[in-house]
Amino acid sequence: MAYTHRQLFQKFMAPTSDAPLALEITRAEGVYLYDSAGKSYIDLISGIAVSNVGHRNPSVVKAIKDQVDAYMHLMVYGEYIQSPQVKLAEALVKSTGTTHLNQVYFTNSGTEAVEGAMKLAKRFTGKTEFISCFNAYHGASQGALSIAGDENFKNAFRPLLPDIRHIHHGCIANLSKITKRTAAVIIEIVAGEAGIKTASPSYFQALRKRCTETGSLLIIDE
């Protein structure tokens, strides 16, 4: 028996929500998705911002094809010198406009980046307390989920990591919760899950100052 793609989706794909959209997308171009019936949809998700320059962007497609013609996956952990990787690392370092953020460790996802940053913070400071914001979301792995600021994400997976505290995004008065026990504060410049909230430059300046005073690292998630 030959299954349709929809049947394969329902039979073999582990569900991630109670009511998936289940659109069968056959192609994408620019801001549009096209289903198996040819109907077009404006893509307001964009792969959660992965496709932020549009689907099948000609410059991106060319870069991918050029790289495939040279080589694809070689090795992780920085063992080999790979031209695209080292050029991107240089560009990222230069984009920070600082002298102390001078090296890059690449990961496959934002969640992995958060996990790596938490491990580094614990190792560097010797402390275990982390502070994040209420309603924040930093990923679904064990460590990243522990610092989530919404209990709805966490209650099915407890016990999680201990020594987690929360502050309100943009509230300078809350910064007193950062103490010498704090390994790191992790925060989004734009709090996406909390409703696309931003904070003033003075808030982030005060946050940076407080972390310096307490010997806590400051982790910026995207």
Can you name each region flagged by the protein language model?
Residues 39, 184, 217-218:
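Hydrophobic "anchor" residues on beta-strands that sit immediately upstream
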Residues 90-187, 191-193, 205:
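PLP-dependent aspartate aminotransferase-fold enzymes
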Residues 22-44:
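Active-site and channel-lining beta-strand-loop segments
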Residues 1-29, 84-85:
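Active-site-adjacent loop/helix segments that line or gate small-molecule/cofactor pockets in enzymes
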Residues 51-52, 81, 173-174, 192-197:
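Short, small-residue-enriched loops and turns at beta-alpha junctions
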Residues 40-127, 131:
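Glycine-rich loop-to-alpha-helix module at the N-terminal edge of alpha/beta enzyme cores
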